[in-house]
């Protein structure tokens, strides 16, 4: 039986626009098991990115409970949350934030340098090959298309084989062919490296890859 690695119960999050309270997440609950893919759809601005940021410990929430690797996020200090994030979590954002002074390969290897791990160039180049980027490894971000930069950002997020990958609209900047290759890579790392994935998408085809499929509507998560 697969182990639960993330559990959110009745998460609530709101913002204020002047004096008006905006409820972004209402009683948001979700459970992620090892080797599982969860997809979340919903219209632009419905709170999908906020949900990922909260689940990935990048944003605070107003009430509720979040456990990652059986650790209650509200009961541990910021330094322990940072350690948990660095050891267990990878992110792919809508905006890739590649460092312009480094090549594509160097950008990908940055997480291994930060964590003091041995460079895994072979694994990195396998991922470049999977996404048809082998010829771009020595290119700088300014020399690459938006789609190429998005794919490199994904490789950077998974190079250390995190237990949980959060991907915010990972195919949003890709054409159909490259979107299919990216989906195939996500499926591969899920199966071969037991990585669990939560991703948001507008694309119905991408949503189909989820073992569990949800829609976020008016702050509430629905199956």
Segments and roles (model prediction):
Residues 41-43:
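The feature captures the beta-strand-to-loop junction immediately N-terminal to the Walker
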Residues 56:
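Helix-to-loop junction immediately C-terminal to a conserved catalytic motif
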Residues 64-75:
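Conserved ABC transporter NBD signature motif
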Residues 102-109:
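Short coil-to-helix segment of the ABC ATPase nucleotide-binding domain corresponding to the Q-loop/switch region
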Residues 140-150:
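Conserved ABC ATPase signature
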Residues 165-168:
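Catalytic Walker B motif of ABC-type/P-loop ATPase nucleotide-binding domains
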